[in-house]
Amino acid sequence: MDLKFATFSSEIELPFYSALFSSKLDHDKLDSSARPVLGLYEPRSQANPEASTRMQILGSALTSDQDESGPLGMTRAEGYIKNVNTIEEFKNTDKNAMIKKAGEQIWDAIQDGTIYSCPSLLASFRILSYADLKKYRFTYWFAFPALHSEPQWKRTEPIGRLNSDESTALVERIGTWRYMVDRREHGFFLAKKVRGEASGPRSSLDDPGVDIGYRWDIGSLRDFETGFFNDAAEEDRYVAFVDPSNYPEYPSWPLRNLLILVRQRYRLNKVQILCYRDTQPRRHEARSIILPLAMDQVGDVELKSMPKVTGWERNGNGDLRPRVANLAEYMDPTRLADQAVDLNLKLMKWRLAPNLDLDTIKNTKCLLLGAGTLGSYVSRNLLGWGVRKITFIDYGSVSFSNPVRQPLFKFEDCHNGGKPKAIQAAEALREIYPGVDVEGYALSVPMLDHPIHNEAKTKAEFDKLKELIDSHDAIFLLMDTRESRWLPTLMGKAANKIVMNAALGFDTYVVMRHGAKPLDDSEDTLGCYFCNDVVVAADSMKDQTLDQQCTVTRPGVAAIASALLVELLTSILQHPLKQHAPAPISAGTGSAVSYERDPHDHPLGLVPHQVRGFLSNFQNMIIRGKSYPQCSACSKPVLDAYREGGWDFVKTALASRDYVAELSGLAEVQRLAEKAAAEMQWSEDEEGMGEEEGEGELI
């Protein structure tokens, strides 16, 4: 009777798709070369025949060690997956050449005997796949290469079976043997009945009164060539394999390759195949079958060339076509969003910026002081870079003029006096991306030249501001007034944080990073927002007309400045010195000015100190400014006084801006300037008198 085989069907765990997604995105990138993947199969005693013979691909299949064999009772299969870059490449891959190459690996291992070290190659497989990382659709096609026997093997006698006692003894003996051999040998082995001896030691679970009249002996495939069967009668010799098939008469696919080995290595044209279908928990069921096989006589048993190879899997409709898994149908939407947020960023590492450190950016905790126009755009750009922790501080409410310029707010947010900006901005970010860790605090920042009306409340606001600055990595100054930025500038410098600042004019903007505390004892560092001031910041809203009180700018200025500010932050984070990175120094002059990357392999380019933009002529200038020894916010005397006095210093400074001017040295600078101006005026007066006398003499 002709022999028929039950083909393998693929069965992929959902976590495997996620692992393949991550592997492609984070490691393989454009590399589409084949990589190992572990397959597993097992006898399923309770499964319908159609549900048996499954090649299982677990979630850990890509990372499993070569010595692993998966859960207890499962047999390993050696596989490779080729995950190509485009669907066109998938379609154009030569499928015949691919399966032929897989068959050659099996054939060569049989020919040179290396199959004995890795019998699991007889159950090998290949996967051709394409992962659409944007749509979470995986197109894949399994191949289970099988070498065809010619002439075919046929069953010569009825199928044999073991009784319950024989099966139990066999299962026990195989279990003992497996502890002594490599896991790759577990699926294929030799078995013989040794008669004339006691059945040998039994498990405590066996019935001690049962004697089957022989004992089982198990050997590896290689043992055939060293005389394993020499002392056994022909009817007591079995070549065995783990058979996941539940069909009463049809063995599973791996037997095809095993029969080639039997012919090519053992030179046999007649053999008893033990299809091992029993498991330890159900060893009394005796499900294994014995196939007496023979093939027609041939002149030479040894094959001279590799036989025909087949084995591409049919899809659910029975067609020779690939399968498609739409992972989006099974994934939690929040998890989908998580992976989608990182997708474009990780694609940067494929070609354009392979050294980009995305984790550093992602894990940077950002504090945004101001949730208005700048705060809205900055937060959206931070989300685009994958930042997961964002905190807003703002004391204002959403007004009807805000939604058209501030993209985090809607018309409904303006009703009933307006929702608190910081709270609503946080809620809006959460709606955009649920995975962001965002908070909002309706908090007033203490400001210079603004009197303290409630000291307890102002101190509580100061304490909360200090707590938030200390717990974040990057501080963004995005408020409307100059004086509101003074205290956060001072606190950020004292805490050695990354401080980012953006300010707008009608058609101009400045984007800058504040200088950090020097790494050495020098005082040479980059300046802050206040280092160009010759007076201490005061109440800028007092006695101002409406157009001076509102931020009147061209609508695109805020978006441009915000984008540059976030890009500057990411460049800082990619520099090995972070906030201590030096500013680039220009080479050349005029239109020929240029800058060099420092370091030269910085993935994003320059890390400037300031970028000043002019929308009237669409130009940017890169500026490098040193810290000012008499700066009202970052000079050493002011920093030392703040570190020593804390709230007491801040309370004094808020009560009298002259105190800050005297402490920093700005007051003395002004006195010297006034004195110099007076002396210059006196000198000009003297020069004028001399000229008049001369003119008189000429006349």
From Swiss-Prot:
Its main location: cytoplasm. It comes from the Eukaryota. Keywords: Autophagy, Cytoplasm, Protein transport, Transport. It is found in: Cytoplasm; Preautophagosomal structure. GO terms for biological process: autophagosome assembly; autophagy of mitochondrion; cellular response to nitrogen starvation; piecemeal microautophagy of the nucleus; protein modification by small protein conjugation; protein transport. One of its GO terms (molecular function) is Atg8 activating enzyme activity. Induction: Up-regulated under amino acid starvation conditions and at late stages during sexual development. The active site is at C550 (glycyl thioester intermediate). Signal peptide: none annotated. GO terms for cellular component: phagophore assembly site. Residues 653-691 are annotated as: Homodimerization. Disruption phenotype: Leads to lethality. Heterokaryotic delta-ATG7/ATG7 strains and RNAi mutants produce aberrant fruiting-bodies. Disulfide bonds: none annotated. E1-like activating enzyme involved in the 2 ubiquitin-like systems required for cytoplasm to vacuole transport (Cvt) and autophagy. Activates ATG12 for its conjugation with ATG5 and ATG8 for its conjugation with phosphatidylethanolamine. Both systems are needed for the ATG8 association to Cvt vesicles and autophagosomes membranes. Autophagy is essential for maintenance of amino acid levels and protein synthesis under nitrogen starvation. Homodimer. Interacts with ATG8 through a thioester bond between Cys-550 and the C-terminal Gly of ATG8 and with ATG12 through a thioester bond between Cys-550 and the C-terminal Gly of ATG12. Also interacts with ATG3. Belongs to the ATG7 family. PANTHER family: UBIQUITIN-ACTIVATING ENZYME E1 (PTHR10953), UBIQUITIN-LIKE MODIFIER-ACTIVATING ENZYME ATG7 (PTHR10953:SF3). The C-terminal residues 653 to 691 are required for homodimerization, as well as the interactions with ATG3, ATG8 and ATG12; and the C-terminal 17 residues are required for the ATG8 lipidation. The GxGxxG motif is important for the function, possibly through binding with ATP. This is Ubiquitin-like modifier-activating enzyme ATG7. It comes from Sordaria macrospora (strain ATCC MYA-333 / DSM 997 / K(L3346) / K-hell).
